[in-house]
Structure formats: structure tokens, C-alpha cells
């Protein structure tokens, strides 16, 4: 059994999610202790618990210690054979983080996985489902991955109530080399729920002004996501070309719609101008998949602590060895041997 110190690296829930997901796809048992030990609320939260239970379900595995607040977890996977699954975070916890774990675990599935996850689709400190659909999956498709995501209903903090549906097809991953970017357009979606429609419109207009000012071809769809539960707003932007880059900003009380749009636009513009083909978020998301294929090399605009942590976990669980050229906080080339 592989033993992982949950306080290692970034020390958050990603350690548990990535460890269990890689354990499932490599058929290796894992024990994680000190889970989120340095966080103000240590142990497993609702979204982390949902993620590890989802990985166990789809891999026909067994869990010990899967309780709210648990500081230690043991996981022994079975086989990922496919099937239909439903998971509910029960709060505004991130559906995107749950899907991230499922997607890694499903990388070697023998059959199609049809999964629905309920919770928050557009929440802080997590990839939005738009980002997964428009950035993560297109980049992974370059490695042979096959999946599609549909947002059935958006969910914002604190009420949640969102629902996302994903279908993941059996696939054979292949190595990737991605070191330069060629961007030809920017697309996006600006959305709001139970707020005046001009909120989403102003978010989009603010983003377009900045991006068009930089000479980019920009089109941002405005979506009225109004429904029976909660309210909120946000915008997800992505750059299209030989790769995908993405940026997200969410609204909150007292935050002007123009600021929401400009935040995402300026972050995306920085990613584009870096010349790197992976943004700072995809730079860590791709690492478990690189560990599964080997012989891959990518460049990211920023080496983050999350990326470094994923490298440590991937090396421990898969036995692969990574080499990094660059320093944390700056651009870097990541290679797996």
C-alpha cells in the first residue's frame, strides 16, 4: 500500500483527490493521512468526500475512513468497468472538482461512464464546468481522451443546486508534446441567475473591451441562468488555437459586473501573451495524465504549488519520473520520462 502524507505540498483536498484517482487507474491501494491538516477546517469536506466516494464507486473499490472531517483514508480500487452514476455534493461544493477526480480515474475505463454530479458549478477555488468543457477536455483530447460535459443547471455559492452531466468514453491515452501556442480567437460565456440580465451583459462587455483592444477576435455568449434556487454570476473565457487557455471570474455582492469581466479578460490576456500553451490551471491538471502516458513534454505559463504537488503524487503512485525546467511562480517546461 502506498502511503501519502496529506499535508505534503499544497496540503489541500487535491492531495486526496489525485491520490485516489491515480490509485484507481493504476490499480494500487493507497492510504492518505494528515488530510488537509494545515487548513482551518481539517479533514474531508463534503466535496472531497463526494470525490473519493465517486472514485471508489466507479472503480468498484473499497474505502475506510470516508467520513466528514476524517483525517485519514484508505482506498483499495477494483476495476473501472463503466456504468451510470449519480453523485450529490449536497452543498455548493464544486461539481468540477468531483469531475476532475472521476475523469482521471476513468482514463483506463473498460466501458462508457455516464455520470451526473449535483452541487456548485461556478464556485471559488475550483474549475468551473465551463472551464472543464472548453479547456480541460479539448487539451486532453490531444492525448486521446474522449469526454463531453453538459451543464444542466448552474449552481452558485452558497445554495448550490447545480447539476452537470458527463459522458466519458473508453480511450487509449497517448503522449503529448505541447510547447508553443498559436491563438486565433477568444470565446466565452457570461452568465447570471436571478439577477438583472444587464449583469451578465456588462460582464461580457467589459471583457470584450479589453480583449478586442488587444486585437483579438472575441465572441462572448450571454446566458440568463435564472431558476428556483439562489443567485449569482460569473464569466468563463477561453482562447482557441492549437491549444486552449482559460480564465474565470465570479460575481459576489458588492463586486461590480465590470470588474468580474475585466478580471477574467486580463488574466486570459496574460496567459495568451506568455506564449505558453497551458495556463496555470491546466498546467497542474494535465500532470496525472502525463504520468499515465510517459514520454510527454509541455510548457505552462506558471509553475504552481498545485503542479508541484501533483508531480510528487504522480511519481509516488505511478513510478514515473518528472523533470521541471523553471521555478515556482514563473513559466516552466514539465517533462515526464
Curated annotation (Swiss-Prot):
Pfam families per UniProt: RTC, RTC_insert
A Gene Ontology cellular-component term: cytoplasm
GO molecular function terms noted in the UniProt entry: ATP binding; RNA-3'-phosphate cyclase activity
Disulfide bonds: none
Top-level division of the source organism's lineage: Archaea
EC supergroup of this enzyme: ligase
Keyword Nucleotide-binding listed: yes
Catalytic activity, reaction form: a 3'-end 3'-phospho-ribonucleotide-RNA + ATP = a 3'-end 2',3'-cyclophospho-ribonucleotide-RNA + AMP + diphosphate
Alphabetized InterPro entries for the sequence: RNA3'-term_phos_cycl_insert, RNA3'_phos_cyclase_dom, RNA3'_phos_cyclase_dom_sf, RNA3'_term_phos_cyc, RNA3'_term_phos_cyc_type_1, RNA3'_term_phos_cycl-like_CS, RNA3'P_cycl/enolpyr_Trfase_a/b, RPTC_insert
Physiological role: Catalyzes the conversion of 3'-phosphate to a 2',3'-cyclic phosphodiester at the end of RNA. The mechanism of action of the enzyme occurs in 3 steps: (A) adenylation of the enzyme by ATP; (B) transfer of adenylate to an RNA-N3'P to produce RNA-N3'PP5'A; (C) and attack of the adjacent 2'-hydroxyl on the 3'-phosphorus in the diester linkage to produce the cyclic end product. The biological role of this enzyme is unknown but it is likely to function in some aspects of cellular RNA processing.
Protein name: RNA 3'-terminal phosphate cyclase
Species annotation: Methanothermobacter thermautotrophicus (strain ATCC 29096 / DSM 1053 / JCM 10044 / NBRC 100330 / Delta H) (Methanobacterium thermoautotrophicum)
Phylogenetic classification of the source organism: Archaea, Methanobacteriati, Methanobacteriota, Methanomada group, Methanobacteria
Amino acid at each position: 500500500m502506498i502511503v501519502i502524507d496529506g499535508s505534503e505540498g499544497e496540503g489541500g483536498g487535491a492531495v486526496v483527490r489525485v491520490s485516489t484517482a491515480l490509485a484507481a487507474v493504476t490499480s494500487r491501494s493507497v492510504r492518505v493521512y494528515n488530510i488537509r491538516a494545515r487548513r482551518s477546517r481539517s479533514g474531508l469536506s463534503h466535496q472531497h468526500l463526494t470525490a473519493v466516494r465517486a472514485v471508489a464507486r466507479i472503480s468498484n473499490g473499497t474505502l475506510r475512513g470516508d467520513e466528514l472531517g476524517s483525517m485519514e483514508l484508505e482506498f483499495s480500487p477494483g476495476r473501472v468497468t463503466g456504468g451510470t452514476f449519480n453523485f450529490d455534493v449536497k452543498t455548493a461544493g464544486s461539481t468540477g472538482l468531483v469531475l476532475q477526480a472521476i475523469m482521471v480515474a476513468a482514463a483506463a475505463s473498460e466501458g462508457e461512464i455516464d455520470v451526473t454530479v449535483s452541487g456548485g458549478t461556478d464556485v471559488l477555488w475550483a474549475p468551473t464546468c465551463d472551464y472543464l468543457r472548453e479547456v480541460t477536455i479539448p487539451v486532453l483530447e490531444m492525448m486521446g481522451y474522449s469526454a463531453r460535459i453538459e451543464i444542466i443547471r448552474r449552481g452558485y455559492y452558497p445554495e448550490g443546486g447545480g447539476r452537470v452531466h458527463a459522458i466519458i468514453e473508453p480511450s487509449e491515452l497517448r503522449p503529448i508534446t505541447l510547447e508553443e501556442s498559436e491563438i486565433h480567437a477568444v470565446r466565452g460565456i457570461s452568465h447570471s441567475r436571478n439577477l438583472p440580465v444587464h449583469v451578465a451583459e456588462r460582464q461580457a462587455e467589459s471583457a470584450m473591451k479589453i480583449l478586442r483592444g488587444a486585437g483579438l477576435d472575441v465572441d462572448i455568449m450571454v446566458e440568463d441562468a435564472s431558476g428556483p434556487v439562489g443567485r449569482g454570476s460569473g464569466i468563463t473565457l477561453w482562447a482557441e488555437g492549437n491549444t486552449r487557455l482559460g480564465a474565470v471570474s465570479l460575481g459576489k455582492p458588492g463586486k461590480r459586473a465590470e470588474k468580474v469581466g475585466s478580471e477574467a479578460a486580463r488574466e486570459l490576456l496574460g496567459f495568451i501573451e506568455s506564449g505558453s500553451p497551458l495556463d496555470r490551471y491546466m498546467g497542474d491538471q494535465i500532470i496525472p495524465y502525463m504520468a499515465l502516458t510517459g514520454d510527454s513534454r509541455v510548457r505552462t505559463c506558471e509553475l504552481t504549488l498545485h503542479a508541484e504537488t501533483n508531480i510528487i503524487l504522480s511519481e509516488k503512485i505511478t513510478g514515473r519520473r518528472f523533470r521541471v525546467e523553471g521555478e515556482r511562480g514563473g513559466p516552466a517546461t514539465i517533462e515526464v520520462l
